[in-house]
């Protein structure tokens, strides 16, 4: 009986790890959508939904001032999202959508280039990029909020959508 219980526990652990390895299904976009580093749709079925609060960054992990430093703020925001998702049992690639607010439209293309670095497999979250006139905190150049789904049963290898 003890061997059966142990085997059941081991199989349960394996199934749990396998579920964590699954990801959402990212529908392939048009050439224009790919060039802007976002997916037109992301399909999930099951998994744990993590709602990421709007994140901004006026200092990096070493305490260096990032006020007005667009690229530094982008890097720090993605670092913070990665840490938060790890605490929730996920990873940055579990993000399925993000809303990006910038206060200078000239930074839009640079953000798209930088986002590619964080999703190198090309499975980009759905996204909106919105220009705002100002933020509540001086020095902020960008704020991002997002949603992640951890351990979803859909994936590009095993799609849930009819193709």
Task: Name each model-derived stretch.
Residues 4-79, 83-96, 102-163:
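N-terminal presequence-like segments and the immediate start of the first folded domain
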């Amino acid at each position: 009986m003890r061997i059966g219980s142990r085997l059941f526990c081991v199989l349960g652990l394996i199934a749990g790890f396998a579920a964590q390895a699954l990801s959402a299904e990212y529908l392939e976009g048009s050439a224009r959508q790919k060039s802007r580093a976002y997916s037109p749709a992301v399909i999930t079925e099951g998994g744990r939904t993590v709602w990421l609060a709007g994140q901004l960054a006026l200092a990096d992990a070493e305490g260096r001032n990032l006020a007005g430093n667009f690229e530094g703020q982008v890097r720090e925001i993605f670092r913070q999202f990665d840490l938060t998702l790890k605490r929730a049992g996920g990873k940055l690639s579990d993000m399925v959508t993000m809303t990006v607010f910038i206060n200078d439209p000239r930074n839009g293309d640079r953000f798209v280039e930088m986002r590619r670095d964080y999703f190198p497999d090309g499975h980009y979250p759905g996204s909106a990029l919105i220009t705002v006139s100002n933020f509540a905190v001086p020095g902020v150049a960008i704020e991002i909020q997002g949603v992640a789904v951890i351990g979803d049963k859909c994936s590009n290898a095993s799609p849930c959508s009819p193709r």
